[in-house]
């Protein structure tokens, strides 16, 4: 999810991309396992948009695992993004851009490649968009993969089922398939990665160098993929930008929410049949997102894709042993403002008195700013540190803190999602709040994109200064500000106290 708050607290509007120079006449044809496709030459790249990686999850296929695409033999033009998955348009406009056409037939991906030919063996970067698992689209201009592709990567962006169409159960579904799948959106992501394994070499990619990366709910998805036995072996590197430490949902809670959803659309709650639930128009379900009857933000624990709570999987060391970059932003908690949450009230709900919180942040006088600072550290910074500690015992792990306050940034720091246009290299297209990118913004964009590409290519985020991996989670951070600065023991005392208070610590070593 993107918030990138301005000083007036307004969310980024969608970054409209400049029209690329497009040619279809000379675009190469790629033969996928499902059939031949032809993209478009955009400037110096070949781009394939709207490629189906799974069959339409409609009718009887709603709330089922993604199914294979029906093969085709006639050349398929792949020059237009596919429909976005059902969502509430107003939320999407505030969190990344207009999703365009919305339809339940939405399981599409896009491929950006500098060399659409088998045997090129380029690193592959698979982007998973954020949006609290209830909105967003892989086809948004903000997520255009061209800049990373020009560095030499094959970039894939994708859609996955959202909201109650993507993460759902109900008494009738539990009876239909006891213990069956409930995290359909995550299964979509896994299906997309399986498509990558099967097809990406034809687009110039190296199937042995696949990195998954995402922001917010996309970062949470990256960690869930690392934790999921169903995704084992489908990728070799991971980047999680601002994942959050919110707990997942149990199947029991999710089923109760499913009953509430049925009731909200006029069906008899827990007694509703699956036939009746599958006949509900998708837009009626999307209209409920962001309300109390919506799950929002987290996965459901207890199916084959998410057998255990995410943090528990990492605590047991059962996650994929792949190199990881993980980090957070200096004003991540500003995202709560989009949902009408008062940071001061949220601080009180944490169960800590103002004086206790004030001791953490003696220089902050305003309760609203105290709430934002505490929310940032509890929801994002401490969680990233905890995951770093746990994963660094298994694989190289690098942690960052994005503090650059550039275009559209708020006075309290870099908002939730502020790093995304720097990573994707779309800052030039973003006339966010009418402010053009500065030379400093472009320098940060270049450094960050170079590091992410280097990680995908080599397994190490090499750059102008050495970024040490955080051996056993001791608190080493790369502060990505106007310059890159390595900070040892970053916020250690405060974060240790938070981790202990949240009972994430587990051992003394985790707090050191």
Which stretches of residues belong to each language-model region?
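Substrate-access "cap/lid" subdomains that shape
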Residues: 95, 191-194, 198, 224, ...
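Bacterial N-terminal signal peptides
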Residues: 10-20
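Bacterial N-terminal signal peptides that target proteins for export
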Residues: 1-12
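Alpha/beta-hydrolase fold nucleophile elbow
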Residues: 203-215
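Non-catalytic accessory segments of hydrolases
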Residues: 23-183, 431-451, 457-466, 483-485, ...
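C-terminal subdomain of alpha/beta-hydrolase-fold enzymes, centered on the catalytic histidine
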Residues: 223, 300-512
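Alpha/beta-hydrolase active-site loop
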Residues: 106, 178-201, 259-260
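Glycine-rich nucleophile elbow surrounding the catalytic serine of serine-hydrolase chemistry
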Residues: 214-224
């Amino acid at each position: 999810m993107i918030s990138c708050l301005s000083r007036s607290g307004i969310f980024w509007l969608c970054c409209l991309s400049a029209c690329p120079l497009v040619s279809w006449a000379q675009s190469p044809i790629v033969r996928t396992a499902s059939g031949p496709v032809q993209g478009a030459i955009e400037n110096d790249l070949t781009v394939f948009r709207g490629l189906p990686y799974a069959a339409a999850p409609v009718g009887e296929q709603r709330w089922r695992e993604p199914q294979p695409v029906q093969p085709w033999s006639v050349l398929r033009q792949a020059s237009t993004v596919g429909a976005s998955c059902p969502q509430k348009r107003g939320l999407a406009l505030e969190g990344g851009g207009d999703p365009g056409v919305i339809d339940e037939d939405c399981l599409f991906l896009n491929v950006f490649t500098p060399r659409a030919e088998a045997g090129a063996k380029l690193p592959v970067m698979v982007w998973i968009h954020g949006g609290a698992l209830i909105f967003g689209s892989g086809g948004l201009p903000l997520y255009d993969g061209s800049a990373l592709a020009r560095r030499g990567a094959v970039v894939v962006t994708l859609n996955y089922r959202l909201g109650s169409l993507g993460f759902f159960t109900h008494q009738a579904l539990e009876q239909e398939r006891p213990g069956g799948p409930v995290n359909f959106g995550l299964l979509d992501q896994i299906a997309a990665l399986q498509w990558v394994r099967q097809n990406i070499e034809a687009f110039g990619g190296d199937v042995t160098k696949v990195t998954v990366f995402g922001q917010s709910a996309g970062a949470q998805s990256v960690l869930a993929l690392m934790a999921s036995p169903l995704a084992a072996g489908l990728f070799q590197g991971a980047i999680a930008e601002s994942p959050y430490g919110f707990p997942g949902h149990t199947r029991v809670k999710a089923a109760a929410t499913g009953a509430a959803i049925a009731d909200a659309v006029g069906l008899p709650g827990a007694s509703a049949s699956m036939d009746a639930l599958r006949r509900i128009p998708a837009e009626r379900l999307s209209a409920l997102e962001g309300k109390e009857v919506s799950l929002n933000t987290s996965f459901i624990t207890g199916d084959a894709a998410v057998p255990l709570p995410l943090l528990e999987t990492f605590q047991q060391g059962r996650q994929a042993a792949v190199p990881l970059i993980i980090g957070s932003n200096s004003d991540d908690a500003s995202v709560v403002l989009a949902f009408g949450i008062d940071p001061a009230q949220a601080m009180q709900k944490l169960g800590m008195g103002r004086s206790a919180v004030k001791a953490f942040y003696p220089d902050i006088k305003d309760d609203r700013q105290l709430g934002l600072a505490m929310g940032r550290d509890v929801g994002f910074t401490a969680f990233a540190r905890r995951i770093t500690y746990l994963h660094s015992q298994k694989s190289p792990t690098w942690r960052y803190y994005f503090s650059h306050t550039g275009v559209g940034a708020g006075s309290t720091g870099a908002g939730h999602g502020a790093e995304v246009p720097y990573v994707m290299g779309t800052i030039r297209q973003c006339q966010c709040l009418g402010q053009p990118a500065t030379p400093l913004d472009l320098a940060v964009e270049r450094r960050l994109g170079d590091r992410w590409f280097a990680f995908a290519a080599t397994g190490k985020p090499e750059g102008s200064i050495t970024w040490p991996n955080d051996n056993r989670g001791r608190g080493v951070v790369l502060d990505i500000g106007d310059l890159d600065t390595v900070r040892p023991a970053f916020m250690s005392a405060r974060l240790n106290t938070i981790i202990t208070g949240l009972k994430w610590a587990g051992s003394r070593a985790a707090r050191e």
